[in-house]
Amino acid sequence: MTSDAMVRLKLSCLFLCVIGFSIVTLLCLYLPDKQIAYNIGRLSAFNASILPSSHSVQLFHTKKNEEVVIAAVICGNRTSQALVMIKSAIVFRGNSDLRIVVIAEKNIQQEFDETLRYWRLLTNDSFSYEIHSIIFPKEHSDEWRKLFQPCASERLFLPTVLNHLDSILYVDTDTLFLSSVEDVWKHFSQMNSSQLAAMVPEHEDMNVGWYNRFANHPYYGKLGLNSGVMLMNLTRMREFDWISRLAPVLEKYRLYLTWGDQDIINVIFHDHPDKVYVYPCRYNYRSDHCMYMSNCKSAEEDGVAVLHGSRSTFQTNKQPAFRALFNAMSQYQLGSDPVKYLLEASASLLNETTSTNCGRLAPIFTHNMRLMFQTV
């Protein structure tokens, strides 16, 4: 082989290597986005096929099944927000025997009682409710009350406050159900005999995780837990002597508890990882899952089950898609056609947010509404 031929052969090999490397690089960059687009496109096509625009449903039939108990702690000016959350639970009651448990300051209990009594009339007595006062232990009472946000740490003491109940689904007031409440509750049956609570990871991505980058106290797993949507087996928590474990954590880490009660929960489950069940991010979907890129695969595949408007995303313009869904639920009147006045209203408001990263994922927010309203 001549020297010129040898040079041409080497150049050809180099060219092929460069082309091959470029193709592999492009595939690595492109395929994740393509997979997300495929998942969202699949939901869009499915959503369009299952519910004709003229379809109307009756939500509040009398068939009942397993009891689902949803509990929330309300203080200060959170009453309106909490009532929207409760409304969403009633809308997505499904076949469950729904019980709403309100733990609130005494000065706002009457408003809850009057509103929930009226909603029972509107919905054919489709749920029951009970109202309790906020109670903190005498030791460290003021500190517990002010930890993180007013009354937020009350949730730590629910095994005692609600000593007549076996299990609850605790939710923050800034949450919305976008799927059947039974969809979350079913995870109790998937917990093993040692697990006493269920939560989602605080983040899905190590690069943006809070606990792994900033926490100065122990936390669960690699990314910590978010406690905004928390299944609590109160019986097992009492057997675990949960309440007695709280004060020692507060005393040891009080200077480092940025997220208050959630941090205490993380410390306990760091020490007892066998006691917690971790379910997918679709059960506590936050703006972190979509504000930069979509990083909650379970929501892409099966839609959002519970939306969490943390960091005031329901009340501000930080995330227009989240505010759109909150406004649609806030404006919806119980007893009216949910297809026209909730599903279509949500879709219309979401359509105005498609210039945002979260808004581009609109099908994941309405997917379970369409399923629910078709099959009720």
Q: Which sequence ranges carry the predicted segments?
A:
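Active-site-proximal specificity loops/subdomain of glycosyltransferases
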Residues: D113, R117-V161
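Short, charged/polar "capping" segments at the starts of alpha-helices
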Residues: S80, K106-E114
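A glycosyltransferase accessory/donor-loop signature
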Residues: T2-V68, I74, R78, Y220-V376
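A short, conserved beta-to-alpha structural element at the edge of catalytic cores
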Residues: S194-N216, K318-L325
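Short, acidic, metal-binding catalytic loop of nucleotide-sugar glycosyltransferases
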Residues: S88-S96
